[in-house]
UniProtKB/Swiss-Prot annotation:
The keyword Secreted applies. GO terms for cellular component: extracellular region. It is found in: Secreted. Residues 23-42 form a propeptide. Belongs to the frog skin active peptide (FSAP) family. Dermatoxin subfamily. It comes from Agalychnis annae. This is Dermatoxin-A1. Residues 1-22 form the signal peptide. The modification Glutamine amide is found at residue 76. Possesses a potent antimicrobial activity against Gram-positive and Gram-negative bacteria. Probably acts by disturbing membrane functions with its amphipathic structure. Its main location: secreted. GO terms for biological process: defense response to bacterium. Keywords: Amidation, Amphibian defense peptide, Antibiotic, Antimicrobial, Cleavage on pair of basic residues, Secreted, Signal.
Length: 77
């Protein structure tokens, strides 16, 4: 009877260890996927931010050029 208990314990142990290892690998894979998703989102946010900054600088440059042109016209007249 003790032999059967030991055998059953061994079978359960050998069955649970690989299951535990697979669950850990699955969690690690999910964590890596989440990190990649977060990095992609940060890159998209940074791209949108840079696009907005570029548009803002273009607008400011246009305003400065217009004002500078007006000053030159006023100085010549």
């Amino acid at each position: 009877m003790a032999f059967l208990k030991k055998s059953l314990f061994l079978v359960l142990f050998l069955g649970l260890v690989p299951l535990f290892l697979c669950e850990n690998e699955k969690r690690e894979g999910e964590n890596e996927k989440e990190e990649n998703d977060d990095q992609s989102e940060e890159k998209r946010s940074l791209g949108s931010f840079m696009k907005g900054v570029g548009k803002g600088l273009a607008t400011v440059g246009k305003i400065v050029a217009d004002q500078f042109g007006k000053l030159l016209e006023a100085g010549q007249g």
